[in-house]
UniProtKB/Swiss-Prot annotation:
Keyword Isomerase annotated: yes
Catalytic activity as recorded in UniProt: aldehydo-D-galactose 6-phosphate = keto-D-tagatose 6-phosphate
Gene3D superfamilies: Sugar-phosphate isomerase, RpiB/LacA/LacB
Description of how the protein assembles with itself and partners: Heteromultimeric protein consisting of LacA and LacB.
Known EC number: 5.3.1.26
Major enzyme class: isomerase
Upper lineage: Bacteria, Bacillati, Bacillota, Bacilli, Lactobacillales
Protein name, UniProt field: Galactose-6-phosphate isomerase subunit LacB 2
Pfam families: LacAB_rpiB
């Protein structure tokens, strides 16, 4: 599988370890940087990973910064990206199976490298399981990427809120 990987300067060594691990598993890597510990800004590298995935150059992406919050938010701004900040296998699998996530984000200073590798493996092995419900959710999320008239509609999520009120969701 072809995977784009990017990070900021705080977690360069963690990214290098992830890249080495993925290569050892037979994956082709697009290393979007950064490549050293010189101060930089995570949005640059989130954008690069997002563009590689959205364009089809890469099948999936992995982004890493200190907490994971900044770079995951940045990559989510790229149209066509559905990124999830994860810290466990359950969240990673859910993000792929239910939300068709195509990028996962990590806090490289939050979780250890071995756990990160296990979570990446779980994410890569998971497959999207389309249902009518999650297709609708994904469609709604994707429509938020463009300024649309629907987005400004105060009833944008009514369909789902009504189901909640009827007790149709069993979390």
């Amino acid at each position: 599988m072809k995977i784009a990987v990017g990070c900021d300067h705080i977690v360069t060594y963690e990214k290098i370890a992830v890249v080495d691990y993925l290569k050892s598993q037979g994956h082709e890597i697009i290393d979007c940087g950064t490549y050293d510990n010189v101060r930089t800004h995570y949005p640059i590298f989130g954008k690069k990973v997002g563009e590689a995935v959205a364009s089809g150059e890469a099948e999936l992406g992995v982004v890493i910064c200190g907490t994971g919050v900044g770079i995951t938010n940045a990559v989510n701004k790229v149209p066509g990206i559905r990124a999830a900040l994860v810290r466990d296998m359950t969240s990673a699998i859910y993000s792929k199976e239910e939300l068709n996530a195509n990028v996962i984000g990590f806090g490289g200073k939050i979780i250890g490298g071995l756990l990160m590798n296990d979570i990446i493996d779980a994410f890569l092995a998971a497959e999207y399981k389309p249902t009518e419900e999650n297709k609708k959710w994904i469609e709604k999320m994707d429509s938020l990427q463009h300024a649309s008239q629907d987005q400004n509609n105060p009833h944008f999520f009514d369909e789902f809120l009504e189901k909640w009120d009827r007790g149709e969701y069993h979390d």
